[in-house]
């Protein structure tokens, strides 16, 4: 479980991951060394990751869709591994229910998506069927909103 200090450090990094450990320490009234050690531990135990999150729209990826994919029994992991090779895959996961895989894909244009379906999806024989949902607008995105660690840890 993440303790209160860990939560506060993560929240500070979510607000500005470029701020120094000294600055975070000053805000939280702890030493720079404590912040450095805690961040190192949080990264090492895979509680958090520090990285840049690009905004696909700002990079010209104006066509986003969610694709639900049904595959032949026992082939979900193989299909996932094939799909994640594509630079257009933003997110992919195995799931339960009617479909076996759900992915979020980004493209510059609908034509580029069409080419992806024809050249990638259609050439994976384990795919039984797909259902695609085009995003009309994005209400919450990882580049604009972070998980509220403090609220999550209360539950």
Functional labels for PLM-detected ranges:
Residues 1-155:
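A compositional/biophysical signature of low hydrophobicity enriched in polar/charged and small residues
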């Amino acid at each position: 479980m993440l303790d209160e200090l860990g939560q506060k450090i993560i929240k500070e990094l979510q607000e500005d991951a470029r701020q120094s450990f000294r600055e975070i320490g000053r805000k939280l009234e702890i030493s720079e060394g404590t912040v450095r050690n805690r961040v190192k531990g949080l990264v090492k135990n895979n509680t958090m990751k520090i990285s840049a999150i690009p905004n696909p729209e700002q990079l010209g990826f104006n066509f986003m869709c969610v694709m639900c994919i049904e595959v032949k029994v026992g082939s979900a992991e193989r299909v996932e591994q094939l799909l994640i090779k594509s630079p257009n895959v933003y997110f992919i996961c195995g799931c339960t229910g009617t479909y076996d895989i759900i992915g979020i894909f980004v493209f510059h244009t609908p034509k580029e998506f069409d080419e992806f379906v024809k050249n990638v999806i259609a050439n994976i024989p384990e795919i039984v069927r797909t259902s695609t949902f085009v995003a009309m607008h994005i209400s919450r995105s990882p580049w604009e909103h972070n998980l509220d660690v403090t609220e999550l840890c209360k539950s």
